[in-house]
Every structure is written in structure tokens, then in C-alpha cells.
From Swiss-Prot:
Glycans are attached at residues 407, 435. This is Ephrin type-A receptor 2. Keywords: Angiogenesis, Apoptosis, ATP-binding, Cell adhesion, Cell junction, Cell membrane, Cell projection, Differentiation, Disulfide bond, Glycoprotein, Kinase, Membrane, Nucleotide-binding, Phosphoprotein, Receptor, Repeat, Signal, Transferase, Transmembrane, Transmembrane helix, Tyrosine-protein kinase, Ubl conjugation. The chain crosses the membrane at residues 538-558. The lineage of its organism: Eukaryota, Metazoa, Chordata, Craniata, Vertebrata. It comes from Macaca fascicularis. The gene is EPHA2.
Length: 976
């Protein structure tokens, strides 16, 4: 036995010396280390001299010690090995690491029937060191220690002893110290190492908060809450939480709460707050770095919170500190006043110096002077402006209802956001004299064979200055004589005229200062003698003529509709363009009309050799097979470009082959920036492939859901404009897509959207009213126009309806249209007049365009050319996108009103968050203490930001959802 132990010791310690130490977590404080003590501990054995024995071996000129026991042939055993008394110190839970080896009982002669392969570990707490007084009853069993590997006979022949490492923990400890004891019950064991330690969470500096070294707790499930302190020049942000972390039993820091931020004038540099350098500033408590002082500011000292403006420059209250200081603009440049009767048109050019700002507006004031007295004063309120005279953004305005024979002086002042901070004004003036009244507006009231009844009108403010009106009339062609009638009224009947004769009539106002402006010369004709006697007959004939003209016009209109592309606007709908679209130079050819689809492929596509294509990884599965990302060698062979590769699966049917090649024949005819580009096909080898350009961001609907809330409205509208441009191109080629949806739009790395997936697409005939009737195939109900669902007929107008749904998908970041409604419910709702509600933060102009796309009558929907034009105008005028459509979160954010069939509100916070697709924030709510619906409904907008919801779109979605959630909770009477 002893010979085996000595031999095992040598081999075992060789393996032990090479074994790496177990990686420890947290900071370990060692209380006892048998291996490091070098045999000087002198542990107590019981019974003395019969069981455990301390053995020594020499390795690398160093003594190696271990306790071993191997009384396997002597019947039942009860051998104890007790450590010295160990002072606990501040430890509450201790960890015990054992390294040992156990010999296989079958390696002994006869199998040693009493042999065991385990031993027991005990501990006892005490406030005193009992010395050599050993009492078993004081010890409590920790565990039975069993090896993972035992050393068998063949291991001895190979001089390899298998080392086991086990770790146990004990706690909480309450006495001053403790003993450990090892009980042998008949095993052959060598104990090489006993290491006892406890754990601390180390001192930590995180998020500009310092956390002290903390002793790990004794109870595994619990976490010790530790308050942190902000580093110098860092503070808890307003409304934020004090920094806290939790020290786990294994010495790891967990669950950080709160944070510190550098105060104004300081920025974060590594783990400290450093004062802003001279010439830099930081004006708030935030994570942002110090900013360089903007233009027209004075150099700032170290640690500045702002930069003072240079003399003559200012900062408006609403200006951010990072904005350069600015000054008022110079006066408007080149002001002109052009008189037009009783109107004056004022025009000017912008100031040559804008003061560094773009918020320039203009104010127009008017002063009138009486020529007789020379007195001047503000213009009377009766003067009218074509638009409000204050806050003008345009550089022209028309002033009307001016009085005749009056001098006017107009002042145009340029102002910007800092003009109110100075007393000086930047203006330019122009004067004009009004010498005449506005010309009368003349109309014919009635006529006979010998008379004409004429009336006229002038603006009311001028009527008081007119004392009479002069009517001049003469026969057309007679320049030698004329007649004059004067009257104080606004009408006159000219008698004694020749029948069936044309007269030239002019009316002029007369004032005390002289003649006013004359009206236009009008031509009026008296009736012929025959015409007056047969008026009824003529009236009847006129009615017939009008009816014939209407019928002829209707026939001509129908002929035009059949000949040209269908024009879908109605006479009273001026929202869309009325111009006729020209026929495209190129018309789409349906590959299915070819007897052999290979002919269409040869005509419209490029055949690629398989050696030029490399498939790299599967990125999806299509209708015909798998879709790969790969590379395509260019014609020069020197460059490879990324491509998407669509394959035709093995075992395909003839119809699948024809449809697969047909899709390639379709794509090969298109060439547009917003249509997916076909690189070529492999049709002569298997598997057949369609190679297209690679779109890095994939399908639009999935991409938007992943980037929820990250884009500006202008970026979203730009995406829609690209899709509309692609569809305009298809429509101009007489092509109907039939499956336009966000899932069939692909997005590249530059956010360019391209129309793809032409599997359901079909061609329109030359007839602009042509449709395509399906053969019973599936129709994407949520995206399809009602007439296409009901009659299985598709037109470009039905594609416009689908585009409206795509607009809604984009503005909602990939929401499912009509949410959880079934297809049957969707069709019923549409036929009942329901339309998808306003998306959150959707510009009014965009939602109006959606509603136009969803007109029940397809003839009233816009064309894609109209849509592109409208979107272009909105993009060129971004301010037009700032007006948001009315938004009702209870409708526009689809919230199930209850959870479960019994009408009970959401039972859990996670269930509610999942219903609004915000489940990624579940842990944020839990960590911040919002663990129940009753707590959630009390949250404010600041609370939502505080728990870590950073994206504005997500903040609004949760906030709007809370409105409906509060209603639900109040309805069922849950107290909040």
C-alpha cells in the first residue's frame, strides 16, 4: 500500500504540476492553502497512525506534500483528517477547492470487497481553537466527494495518475473560525491540494461611477446592492437614478442601474471628467463631448459652459449653443413698386447679408399722404394685401384697394431671429402715386333690336371719390362719330340703336381730380328683327345643337380613351395632372407568348457560364428553390461583383421551368434605377440560375422592422419616391405587377429601393383599359385593390392601390396591413369604406396621397406619373412634411383590448410589450421596477426615456400605447 502511494505520488505530482489552475471569477481571498504551506500545517489524524498519512516527494528540487490513505484490504474504515483552526475574518461564505486522486477498487487483488471510491467532507464552526481535542459530533457533513475519473491498473503501467478537482461552498458562517475534516470510509485516496477562500466583488469604475470593493454575499439567490459615487466633476443627470450595482455571491458585479454624466464644462476622457480645453465648451450635463466654439464667438476659457458672442453678433433664445452667433440682416435689396390702377405690386430681392441665418422674414408697412394738405398717416384698414404683410417669406406682395390721387410710401423691413435683440432696423422704402381709379368691370345685362343694357362695378373704397360715370359708345367700324352718356348710377340702357349691329362700349369713372382709368372696350351686338320674333324657335334649335355637340364629344372621348393610355382623373379632380401621357418608346413583350420560353430568354437575357458564378451562402428560399449570395466574374475576368443567385430546385416540373425562365425573360426587358437588375441566366446547365444584382439590406419590410424609428421622414419619402419611379417605368411599358408589397421591394446599402419579384406580374395589352384575369391563383388580399379581388382583373390602377399599402407599410416601419384581421374581415372592411388609419408621425400630405390611392373607383386614383411628381414636390419642399396628419393611437397602433377570452386586461408587462412589438425592452422595464401593469400605466414620457428607450419612434409607440392601456385598465376597474 505504501509503495503504491509513494509511486503514485511521483507520477501524480508530475501531472499536478502541469495542470492549469481553474479560472476564478471575482477577487479571491485565500484563507487556507495546503499545497502552498509545504507540509508545515500539521493536520490532526484520527485514529492516530492508522489512517491518513502525510507523504513527501521531491520534484525540481522542491518538496511536494500530500495526505493519502489506502486501507482497502482491512475491512470497514473510519479514518479522519482534520485541518487546523482557520480564522474566518470577514468571510460569510467560503469556497473549498480539492485536488485528489482515487484508485480503482478493481485494481486490487480479489477486488477488495470493502473498498470504496469516495470520501466525505465535513466542517465545524467554533470561536476557539480546540487544539488536538477532536470530537466527531461537532462536525457537519458538507458532501460526499466522488471522483470524475478513477486511476485504473493500465494508468499505473503508463505512469499516469488521473487528477480530480472538486469545489464546494459553505455559508453563511457566523462563528470566528472553522475546521474542515475529511473522512475515509475505505478508499484509496491521495489529497494533493486543499484551498479555502472567499470572494469579493473588486473595486470598479463604470459609467463614471466608483464602486468600492465589496464582500460577496452568503446567500446564492440574493444580490448585495452597492451604491456608487460619481467621479470628480460628474453628477447624476436631472431626473436620473443614483448609480447602483449588485454584488453576486460569485464576486461578479451585476445589474447596473443609473449612471453619472460629466457636468457642464467637462467631457468624458476614459474613466474621468476632464475640463473642456480653451476654445471649447459644453453647456449641459450629457454624454456628448466638448464642442469647439462656433463662428463669431470669443475664445472661451478652460471648463467653459458657453462661448460669448462677438460684439455686434447675438444668439436668439431658441438657438442651440453650438450654433454660430448671428446678426440682423441688411436691408432688402432692389425694392420696386409698380402701380396698376388701384393696385401696387411690390418686389424686392433678399438682403445681401443674411446675418448668417436662414430664418429671414419680411414686414411691409404702408403710409399714405394727401396731396392737398401734405399730411401723412398709416394706410387705412381698407387696404388689402395679397398675403399677411408681417412674417412674409416670399419677396413680393400685391397691395390693392388703394385710393386714387393719393401718394403711398411702402417700407419693407428684413428681420431674422436676432432682430428683436437690437433697436436698429434694416429696411428699404419705395413711393408711388395713384392717379386713377381702377378700371370699371363692364358686363352686358340685356339687349333688343334697338337697345343694349350695360352695368359695371369698381372697388367700394373708390366709389366715394367718383361723382359720375361716362359711357362712350359707337358703331364698330365708324371712327368718325361717337355718343357719350353720363350717369351717377352703375348701369345704363343705350337706346335708339340700329338692329343687328355691333357697338363698341367703354365706361370711365369721373372724379373731382379728373378722369379715372377707362374700362376695356367691349363689343356688344343688338338683335336682328327676325331673331326677336322667333326667339323660341332659335332656343329649341340651340338646345338640339348643344345635345348633338355633347354626344359628339362623348364619342370622341371614348375613342381617345381606347386609343391612348387610360387617364384616371375626373374633370372636377384638379389634384392630378390632366396632360396625356405619351406612349412609351419600348413596350413590354410577354415571354409566355413565345412557343418556346427559351427563345425569350435568348432574346432578352445574357447567358452566363457556370464557371463565372460562385455560390457562397444561402440567404433565403424562393418559389422555385434556394436563393444564394455569391459572386460573378466580370467579362474581363479581373473583378468579381456580389450578386444574388436564384436556383431552380431539382425535380422541377415543366410548368416550373417555364415560369422560372419566364421571370428571367421579364426582368431582362427592364432597365431602370429602381427595378432590380438582371445580370444574366444559366439555362444550359443544371441547376438553372437567375443572377441579379445583390441588395445588401434585403426585403424592405424586414429592413424597416429592424431599423424601427431610425430614419427621418424625408428619408422614408425618398424611399417611396424610388418605388414610385420604378412603378412609373413599368406602367409606361404597359406592365402590371399584381404583387406590389414591401416584401417584394429590395433595398441596397445606399437605401435605394428597387421593385422585384415578377412571379405574379403580367402584361397589359395595348388597350389602356386592358386587364389580366388570373386562372384561380392566390391573390395577396391585404395589398390588392377591391376590383381585382372581386373580378380577378388587374390594371395599373390596382397597382396604385397596392402602392398606397406600401406607403403605409413604410411609414409604420413594416407593420402588417390590417393587423390580425382575417382576409375575409379585410375584404368586408374595405367594401364598407374602411381604410387603414394614419401612421404615427405621418405627414398630412403623405396620408392624403395614400387615401387618393385607395379610392374605391379606380378611375379616380392617381397615375404613377402623378405620384412621382407629388413626391418630388414634397422632397423639394421639406417644410411641407412638417404638418402631421391627425393620429389616434387607439386606432393607428393596433392594441388587443384584452388578453385571454375572459376580457381580462394584459396580465403581464411582457405580454403587453409583445402586443405592440416592443418586447426587446422587457428587461429594461423589469430592471427599473415596472413589473406589473398597475405600475406601467403610471409611467410618464420621462420615465420611458429613463429606463433606456432611446429611439424617438419607440418612445412614441410606447407612450401612445399607454393611452389606450390606461383606458382598458380603467374600464375594468383596476385601481391605479
Amino acid at each position: 500500500m505504501e509503495l503504491w502511494a509513494a509511486r503514485a505520488c511521483f507520477v501524480l505530482l508530475w501531472g499536478c504540476a502541469l495542470a492549469p489552475a481553474t479560472a476564478a471569477q471575482g477577487k479571491e481571498v485565500v484563507l487556507l492553502d495546503f499545497a502552498a504551506a509545504g507540509g508545515e500545517l500539521g493536520w490532526l489524524t484520527h485514529p492516530y497512525g492508522k489512517g491518513w498519512d502525510l507523504m513527501q516527494n521531491i520534484m525540481n528540487d522542491m518538496p511536494i506534500y500530500m495526505y493519502s490513505v489506502c486501507n482497502v484490504m482491512s475491512g470497514d474504515q473510519d479514518n479522519w483528517l482534520r485541518t487546523n483552526w482557520v480564522y474566518r475574518g470577514e468571510a460569510e461564505r467560503i469556497f473549498i477547492e480539492l485536488k485528489f486522486t482515487v484508485r480503482d477498487c478493481n485494481s486490487f487483488p480479489g477486488g477488495a470487497s470493502s473498498c470504496k471510491e469516495t470520501f466525505n467532507l465535513y466542517y465545524a464552526e467554533s470561536d476557539l481553537d480546540y487544539g488536538t481535542n477532536f470530537q466527531k459530533r461537532l462536525f457537519t457533513k458538507i458532501d460526499t466527494i466522488a471522483p470524475d475519473e478513477i486511476t485504473v491498473s493500465s494508468d499505473f503501467e503508463a505512469r499516469h495518475v488521473k487528477l480530480n478537482v472538486e469545489e464546494r461552498s459553505v455559508g453563511p458562517l457566523t462563528r470566528k473560525g472553522f475546521y474542515l475534516a475529511f473522512q475515509d470510509i475505505g478508499a484509496c485516496v491521495a489529497l494533493l491540494s486543499v484551498r479555502v477562500y472567499y470572494k469579493k466583488c473588486p473595486e470598479l469604475l463604470q459609467s463614471l461611477a466608483r464602486f468600492p470593493e465589496t464582500i460577496a454575499g452568503s446567500d446564492a439567490p440574493s444580490l448585495a446592492t452597492v451604491a456608487g459615487t460619481c467621479v470628480d466633476h460628474a453628477v447624476v443627470p436631472p431626473g436620473g437614478e443614483e448609480p447602483r450595482m449588485h454584488c453576486a455571491v460569485d464576486g461578479e458585479w451585476l445589474v447596473p442601474i443609473g449612471q453619472c454624466l460629466c457636468q457642464a464644462g467637462y467631457e468624458k476622457v476614459e474613466d474621468a471628467c476632464q475640463a473642456c480645453s480653451p476654445g471649447f465648451f459644453k453647456f449641459e450635463v450629457s454624454e456628448s463631448p466638448c464642442l469647439e466654439c462656433p463662428e463669431h464667438t470669443l475664445p472661451s476659457p478652460e471648463g467653459a459652459t458657453s462661448c460669448e458672442c462677438e460684439e455686434g453678433f447675438f444668439r436668439a433664445p431658441q438657438d442651440p449653443m453650438s450654433m454660430p452667433c448671428t446678426r440682423p440682416p441688411s436691408a432688402p435689396h432692389y425694392l420696386t413698386a409698380v402701380g396698376m390702377g388701384a393696385k401696387v405690386e411690390l418686389r424686392w430681392t433678399p438682403p445681401q447679408d443674411s446675418g448668417g441665418r436662414e430664418d429671414i422674414v419680411y414686414s411691409v408697412t404702408c403710409e399714405q399722404c394727401w396731396p392737398e394738405s401734405g399730411e401723412c398717416g398709416p394706410c387705412e384698414s381698407s387696404v388689402r394685401y395679397s398675403e399677411p404683410p408681417h412674417g412674409l417669406t416670399r419677396t413680393s406682395v400685391t397691395v390693392s384697394d388703394l385710393e386714387p390721387h393719393m401718394n403711398y410710401t411702402f417700407t419693407v423691413e428684413a428681420r431674422n431671429g436676432v432682430s428683436g435683440l437690437v433697436t436698429s432696423r434694416s429696411f428699404r422704402t419705395a413711393s408711388v402715386s395713384i392717379n386713377q381709379t381702377e378700371p370699371p368691370k363692364v358686363r352686358l345685362e340685356g339687349r333688343s333690336t334697338t337697345s343694349l343694357s350695360v352695368s359695371w362695378s369698381i372697388p367700394p373704397p373708390q366709389q366715394s371719390r367718383v361723382w359720375k360715370y361716362e359711357v362712350t359708345y359707337r358703331k364698330k367700324g365708324d371712327s368718325n362719330s361717337y355718343n357719350v352718356r353720363r350717369t351717377e348710377g352703375f348701369s345704363v340702357t343705350l337706346d335708339d340703336l340700329a338692329p343687328d349691329t355691333t357697338y363698341l362700349v367703354q365706361v370711365q369713372a369721373l372724379t373731382q381730380e379728373g378722369q379715372g382709368a377707362g374700362s376695356k372696350v367691349h363689343e356688344f351686338q343688338t338683335l336682328s328683327p327676325e331673331g326677336s320674333g322667333s326667339l323660341a324657335v332659335i332656343g329649341g334649335v340651340a338646345v338640339c345643337v348643344v345635345l348633338l355637340l355633347l354626344l359628339a364629344g362623348a364619342g370622341f372621348f371614348i375613342h381617345r380613351r381606347r386609343k391612348n393610355l387610360r387617364a384616371r382623373q375626373s374633370p372636377e379632380d384638379v389634384y392630378f395632372s390632366k396632360s396625356e401621357q405619351l406612349k412609351p418608346l419600348k413596350t413590354y413583350v410577354d415571354p409566355h407568348t413565345y412557343e418556346d420560353p427559351n427563345q425569350a430568354v435568348l432574346k432578352f437575357t445574357t447567358e452566363i457560364h457556370p464557371s463565372c458564378v460562385t455560390r457562397q451562402k444561402v440567404i433565403g428560399a424562393g418559389e422555385f428553390g434556394e436563393v444564394y449570395k455569391g459572386t460573378l466574374k466580370t467579362s474581363s475576368g479581373k473583378k468579381e461583383v456580389p450578386v444574388a443567385i436564384k436556383t431552380l430546385k431539382a425535380g422541377y416540373t415543366e410548368k416550373q421551368r417555364v415560369d422560372f425562365l419566364g421571370e428571367a425573360g421579364i426582368m431582362g426587358q427592364f432597365s431602370h434605377h429602381n427595378i432590380i437588375r438582371l445580370e444574366g441566366v444559366i439555362s444550359k446547365y443544371k441547376p438553372m440560375m437567375i443572377i441579379t444584382e445583390f441588395m445588401e439590406n434585403g426585403a424592405l419590410d424586414k429592413f424597416l422592422r429592424e431599423k424601427d424609428g431610425e430614419f427621418s421622414v424625408l428619408q422614408l419619402v425618398g424611399m417611396l419616391r424610388g418605388i414610385a419611379a420604378g412603378m412609373k417605368y413599368l406602367a409606361n411599358m404597359n406592365y402590371v405587377h399584381r404583387d406590389l408589397a414591401a416584401r417584394n421591394i429590395l433595398v441596397n446599402s445606399n437605401l435605394v429601393c428597387k421593385v422585384s419579384d415578377f412571379g405574379l406580374s403580367r402584361v397589359l395589352e395595348d388597350d389602356p383599359e386592358a386587364t389580366y384575369t388570373t386562372s384561380g391563383g392566390k391573390i395577396p388580399i391585404r395589398w390588392t385593390a377591391p376590383e381585382a379581388i372581386s373580378y380577378r382583373k388587374f390594371t395599373s390602377a390596382s397597382d396604385v392601390w397596392s402602392f398606397g399599402i406600401v406607403m403605409w407599410e413604410v411609414m409604420t416601419y413594416g407593420e402588417r396591413p390590417y393587423w390580425e384581421l382575417s382576409n375575409h374581415e379585410v375584404m368586408k372592411a374595405i367594401n364598407d369604406g374602411f381604410r387603414l388609419p394614419t401612421p404615427m408621425d405621418c405627414p398630412s400630405a403623405i396620408y392624403q396621397l395614400m387615401m387618393q390611392c385607395w379610392q374605391q373607383e379606380r378611375a379616380r386614383r392617381p397615375k404613377f406619373a402623378d405620384i412621382v411628381s407629388i413626391l418630388d414636390k414634397l422632397i423639394r419642399a421639406p417644410d411641407s412634411l412638417k404638418t402631421l396628419a391627425d393620429f389616434d393611437p387607439r386606432v393607428s397602433i393596433r392594441l388587443p383590448s384584452t388578453s385571454g377570452s375572459e376580457g381580462v386586461p394584459f396580465r403581464t408587462v411582457s405580454e403587453w410589450l409583445e402586443s405592440i412589438k416592443m418586447q426587446q425592452y422587457t428587461e429594461h422595464f423589469m430592471a427599473a421596477g415596472y413589473t406589473a401593469i398597475e405600475k406601467v400605466v403610471q409611467m410618464t414620457n420621462d420615465d420611458i426615456k429613463r429606463i433606456g428607450v432611446r429611439l424617438p419612434g419607440h418612445q412614441k409607440r410606447i407612450a401612445y400605447s399607454l393611452l389606450g392601456l390606461k383606458d382598458q385598465v380603467n374600464t375594468v376597474g383596476i385601481p391605479i
